[in-house]
Regions:
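Single conserved hydrophobic/aromatic residue that forms the stacking wall/gate
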Residues: 121-130
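GST-like domain detector, emphasizing the conserved glutathione-binding G-site
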Residues: 1-118
Length: 130
């Protein structure tokens, strides 16, 4: 059985979706980020950067952190969505999502929904004089 340590974030959702698609038995353990549960010593043992998601595969007692690494692990383990002959292309797009697309969307959401500030009143000369 796979245990998924997660929270309600896009990276956490990716793993839940994959686990559903590959039809693996899994248990969800919610990590309360606002209460700092990700900083507890027992969590740091499985997630050295104190981030979610993380899985523990109780069949072999291995833990995997980082959403991309987890997706690759589950793809290999299930023999689904990660065929050997397409892994180069899959890995390229996965890394692009993790390193470029995902963070940019995250920044957009952070500033658009949680810290909205209008900059429309600033003109180019005002911006350049700062």
């Amino acid at each position: 059985m796979i245990e998924l340590f997660t929270a309600d974030t896009p990276n956490g959702w990716k793993i839940s979706i994959m686990l559903e698609e590959i039809n693996f038995d899994y248990k969800i353990s919610k990590v309360n980020l606002s209460e700092g549960e990700q900083h507890k010593p027992e969590f740091k043992k499985i997630s050295p950067f104190n981030k979610i998601p993380v899985i523990t595969d109780h069949e072999n007692n291995k833990s995997v952190f980082e959403s991309g690494a987890i997706l690759m692990y589950l793809g290999e383990k299930s023999n689904m969505f990660y065929p050997e002959d397409n892994r180069l292309e899959i890995n390229q797009w996965l890394m692009a999502q993790m390193g470029l697309i995902g963070p940019m969307i995250g920044q957009h959401h952070q500033f658009h929904y949680y810290h909205p500030v209008s900059y429309t009143h600033l003109t180019l000369p005002t911006i350049c004089s700062v």
